[in-house]
Amino acid sequence: MIGIYKIENTINHKVYIGQSVDIEMRWKEHLYALTRNLHENHHLQNSWNKYGAKAFTFSIIEECELSCLTDREQYYIDLYGGINSDNNYNNRDAGYKGNLSESTK
């Protein structure tokens, strides 16, 4: 399934918004990294470590065409306060595929 997904901390209600052409596989990748303390998003990883897996939910928030993935991901990142906000674990704009700098992590 192609679309936009949300990982939400049910305790503090912070969210991580992402996009994928295979949402189920992407969720498995997040789980793999988070459970091994390897997630590239240090803010999300720290919350996972603090609150535990049971404090997080994963949901698909929109199915969309491949051509609109980045625009829709950015829409939801902005809807939840934008990058590096108090409501959002996202630390880069939608569609970014490069490596994070140490300061961004």
Predicted segments, located by residue:
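Structure-specific nucleic-acid interaction/processing domains
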Residues: 1-105
